[in-house]
């Protein structure tokens, strides 16, 4: 059975394509499950052979797509450590942080037949876990909003500045209150391990959400 290495195929690009497609679905599902937007703006779709809820709101969808478009070059170069969906209350204080911790093996040689099928199974399991995360999380206060943060390796700063010049969607340094949350508990949701990608998903939830 033939094997593929990084020299034969741009695995960074493959991983970035797979991961950004997954993150788009995951972000939509988080917003639906956690009641950040009215359920009426979501439609049921099929992804990874499971039903998911996807937004039909053009501006919201564009924001998510633009964000992931800027994240993608960082994933390709293995410079993104975490992608975080931050849920904030009316005072813009975080009440939940969905953290996708990403790592890629530096070297690999895998069979082409198993490149995608195994990863899709793992991503399906992660989507299913997100869809039922309400069971382990407390309700959020009304009027919550969200933002997406990216934690990068130090060497990625210059690359982010280049992307900022190209895209009309500038990177800004996150506010300290968005990055750190006091009195939070950590709730592990799912871990996946494959030949091309390792990812851990957990939630940091504020103990007292009511202000």
UniProtKB/Swiss-Prot annotation:
UniProt subcellular location: Nucleus; Cytoplasm, Cytoskeleton, Spindle; Cytoplasm
One GO location term (cellular component): zeta DNA polymerase complex
Keyword Transcription regulation tagged: yes
Keyword terms of this UniProt record: Cell cycle, Cell division, Cytoplasm, Cytoskeleton, DNA damage, Mitosis, Nucleus, Transcription, Transcription regulation
InterPro entries: HORMA_dom, HORMA_dom_sf, Mad2-like
Claim: Protein biosynthesis is one of the keywords in the record: no
Domain HORMA positions: 13-203
GO terms of biological process kind: cell division; DNA damage response, signal transduction resulting in transcription; negative regulation of protein catabolic process; negative regulation of ubiquitin protein ligase activity; positive regulation of DNA-templated transcription; positive regulation of peptidyl-serine phosphorylation
Role noted for this protein: Adapter protein able to interact with different proteins and involved in different biological processes. Mediates the interaction between the error-prone DNA polymerase zeta catalytic subunit rev3l and the inserter polymerase rev1, thereby mediating the second polymerase switching in translesion DNA synthesis. Translesion DNA synthesis releases the replication blockade of replicative polymerases, stalled in presence of DNA lesions. May also play a role in signal transduction in response to DNA damage.
Name of the featured protein: Mitotic spindle assembly checkpoint protein MAD2B
Taxonomic source organism: Danio rerio (Zebrafish)
